[in-house]
Design a protein with these regions (language model features):
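Aromatic (phenylalanine/tyrosine) cluster motif
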Residues: 11-12
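Conserved N-terminal beta-strand and adjoining loop/helix that marks the start
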Residues: 16-37, 58
Length: 153
């Protein structure tokens, strides 16, 4: 490991050798209702199977994050949403890939969410978050949500 200075600045950036990863851009929905947040359990046979996450998916080439999210929610949950503001962004590297994930505040506009491409759906309160296991890429968001009670209303 080396430390290198950034010219003109008084701080240092840790420089390490990293493996080249496949970069994946993901949009995820934060859907709140009655002080509860919608989460989905990842199906078996996929990366991070069995962990809980926020509904959404991979962005296709030429697609906006907002359009991606609307498409993914229709495909995975059979319901419509309005995509609101960007709440949080995180870039996380796993051993096999790097995930650039953007979390948007969303509202249900059509239908009731159904578990089409996930094992299960749950509406959880802020106090129940610790009872579920989430991917590492979601941990920073969960810490942020813990500090933002106004989002749960």
């Amino acid at each position: 490991m080396r430390w290198r200075s950034l010219s003109g600045h008084r701080f240092f950036v840790k420089s390490t050798t990293m493996r080249k990863h496949t970069a994946v851009e993901v949009a995820a929905a934060l859907v709140f209702r009655n002080e509860k947040l919608l989460i989905a359990r990842r199906p078996s046979g996929v990366h991070l199977a069995g962990l809980w996450e926020f509904p959404g998916g991979k962005r296709e080439q030429g697609e906006s994050f907002e359009s991606c999210l609307q498409r993914e929610i229709w495909e995975e949950l059979d319901c419509g949403i309005t995509v609101g503001s960007l709440v949080f962004k995180n870039v996380h590297s796993y051993s096999e890939k790097t995930v650039d994930i953007r979390f948007y505040h969303c509202k249900l506009t059509q239908g009731e969410p159904r578990a089409i491409e996930c094992d299960a759906l749950e509406w959880i309160t802020k106090d129940q978050v610790a009872d579920y296991s989430f991917p590492e890429a979601d941990v920073a968001l969960l810490e942020y949500l813990d500090r933002c009670p106004h989002l749960w209303v």
